[in-house]
């Protein structure tokens, strides 16, 4: 019997990354204590190699492999490139932080790369099992990363909470997927869409399955009422891990929603739109209101994330190419702002001191004016003040929602954004108008200063000239639908 090998081309980046993870682990095993940075540089080299491979196979044509379970298209390739850049930035920001806290070891970098592999699989999944495998690879890596600082009781507690709630969410998702399979007899997303479109299956079973699927998605996006894990994990995890959790996985979550809700369950749009409206409004309300009361800056940014995810969901509610592309643009803007915020928090932290309270930023302008200015740009952008990228991201989503006819939703979103501006501007007040509690100057390596500068510059320039990034998002959506 002849055995035909599948065309591995769409999966070349994943195969390359998997091989390089093995190299990183072996190199770290034999490197010894004096060469601990070897795993760091190999990880950056791996991400650069993945980017080159992805660019080499990039095409606007849709390519399938592994009997249609894995897909390569413009959206998956662009999301993967964004994931590589984000993970590389996280590693550079985190280098000094993890070095002074005993986390500069191969396990940290191996887990980060395995999590990256999970994200890549998620954005290229064309099958419910592939989606779930990518999600679990990402989730299990993140659980281990949170618990990596074994001597920290709060980190261990956060990891246990993350694991238990994550397992519950995975159960919801699996149950929903099993209902969809029971109703259609297929796990392939295109086949699922065909059966739904034909109207052959029982609509009630679809709705039950859809409820569980949306609940699982809500957890992964930290949307209310499935947000309980986010504040505790953001606060309890080492800041480097918090930055990782709060940045790159959002691209994977966006790809997950696009593949499952839009690609597989697109004909049920009127059903899942109603569910997403509830999640979006609740997320924006709870996130913005709860953030006001926080004194811990990591918890505040966790609630901020919840409110931002509400805006991301608005793009899916608007539907259509404009809605989905504005949602993708918002995710890019959010990740850019998150990198800047947590990167600066890690720079303010030092050995034996964690800058995890809002008051720790008091007088930052006197200690390091340049760093304070970068944080000011990030906070202005998060608040949605022009000409920052955060303003245009909010504007593009609201325009799409308005075009879809949800005028009341636009009014609610604007009102809740105004409430949210308070806690962002409060940080600026602490940095510029309060006396510093710490007088020690803030020192860091030149490459980190360059990265923060690029981060801040991108927030301004992409806000003033968003056409290229918006066009990229629109192109990715058009070629994947």
Swiss-Prot record:
Xref: Pfam families: Proton_antipo_M
Single annotated GO MF: NADH dehydrogenase (ubiquinone) activity
Coiled-coil segments on the chain, per record: none
Membrane topology field: Multi-pass membrane protein
Subcellular location(s) of the protein: Cell inner membrane
Catalytic activities: a quinone + NADH + 5 H(+)(in) = a quinol + NAD(+) + 4 H(+)(out)
Role this protein plays: NDH-1 shuttles electrons from NADH, via FMN and iron-sulfur (Fe-S) centers, to quinones in the respiratory chain. The immediate electron acceptor for the enzyme in this species is believed to be ubiquinone. Couples the redox reaction to proton translocation (for every two electrons transferred, four hydrogen ions are translocated across the cytoplasmic membrane), and thus conserves the redox energy in a proton gradient.
Gene: nuoN
Assigned keywords, A-Z: Cell inner membrane, Cell membrane, Membrane, NAD, Quinone, Translocase, Transmembrane, Transmembrane helix, Transport, Ubiquinone
Cellular-component GO terms for this entry: plasma membrane
Gene Ontology BP term (one): ATP synthesis coupled electron transport
Record's protein name: NADH-quinone oxidoreductase subunit N
Documented EC number(s): 7.1.1.-
Family recorded in the similarity comment: Belongs to the complex I subunit 2 family.
Principal place of residence: membrane
UniProt keyword annotation of DNA-binding present: no
Subunit structure: NDH-1 is composed of 14 different subunits. Subunits NuoA, H, J, K, L, M, N constitute the membrane sector of the complex.
Residue ranges crossing the lipid bilayer per the database entry: 11-31, 37-57, 74-94, 103-123, 128-148, 162-182, 205-225, 238-258, 272-292, 300-320, 328-348, 371-391, 405-425, 457-477
HAMAP family xrefs: NDH1_NuoN_1
Enzyme class, first EC level, given as a word: translocase
């Amino acid at each position: 019997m002849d055995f035909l090998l599948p065309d591995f081309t769409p999966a070349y980046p994943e195969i390359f990354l998997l091989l390089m993870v093995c190299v990183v682990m072996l190199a770290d095993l034999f490197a010894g204590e004096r060469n601990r940075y070897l795993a760091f540089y190999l990880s950056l080299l791996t991400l650069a190699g993945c980017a080159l491979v992805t660019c080499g196979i990039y095409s606007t044509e849709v390519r399938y492999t592994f009997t249609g379970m894995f897909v390569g298209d413009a959206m998956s390739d662009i999301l993967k490139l964004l994931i590589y850049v984000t993970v590389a930035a996280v590693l550079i920001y985190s280098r000094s932080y993890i070095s002074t806290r005993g986390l500069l070891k191969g396990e940290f970098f191996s887990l980060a790369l395995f999590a990256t592999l999970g994200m890549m699989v998620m954005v290229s999944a064309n099958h419910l099992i592939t989606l779930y495998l990518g999600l679990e690879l990402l989730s299990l890596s993140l659980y281990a990363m949170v618990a990596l600082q074994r001597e920290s009781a709060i980190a261990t507690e956060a990891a246990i909470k993350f694991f238990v709630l994550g397992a519950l969410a995975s159960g919801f998702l699996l149950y929903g997927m099993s209902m969809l399979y029971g109703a259609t007899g297929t796990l392939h997303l295109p086949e699922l869409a065909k059966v739904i479109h034909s109207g052959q299956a029982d609509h009630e079973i679809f709705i039950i399955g859809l409820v569980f699927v949306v609940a699982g998605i809500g957890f992964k996006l930290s949307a209310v009422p499935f947000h309980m894990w986010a504040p505790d994990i953001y606060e309890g995890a080492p800041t480097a891990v918090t930055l990782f959790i709060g940045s790159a996985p959002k691209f994977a979550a966006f790809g997950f929603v696009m593949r499952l809700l839009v690609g597989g369950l697109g004909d049920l749009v009127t059903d899942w739109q109603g569910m997403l409206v509830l999640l979006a409004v609740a997320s924006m309300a709870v996130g913005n209101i709860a953030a006001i009361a926080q004194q811990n800056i990591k918890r505040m940014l966790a609630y901020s994330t919840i409110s931002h995810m509400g805006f991301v969901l608005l793009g899916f509610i608007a539907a259509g190419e404009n809605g989905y592309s504005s949602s993708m643009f918002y995710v890019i803007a959010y990740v850019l702002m998150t990198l800047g915020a947590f990167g600066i928090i890690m720079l303010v932290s030092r050995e034996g001191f964690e800058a995890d309270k809002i008051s720790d930023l008091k007088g930052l302008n006197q200690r390091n004016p340049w760093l304070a200015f970068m944080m000011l740009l990030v906070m202005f952008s998060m608040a949605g003040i022009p000409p920052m990228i955060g303003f245009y991201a909010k504007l593009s989503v609201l325009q799409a929602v308005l075009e879809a006819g949800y005028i009341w939703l636009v009014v609610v979103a604007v009102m809740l954004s105004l409430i949210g501006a308070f806690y962002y501007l409060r940080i600026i007040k602490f940095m510029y108008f309060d006396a510093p509690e710490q007088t020690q100057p803030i020192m860091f390596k030149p490459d980190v200063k360059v990265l923060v500068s690029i981060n801040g510059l991108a927030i301004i320039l992409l806000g003033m000239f968003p056409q290229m990034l918006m066009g990229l998002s629109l192109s990715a959506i058009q070629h994947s639908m």
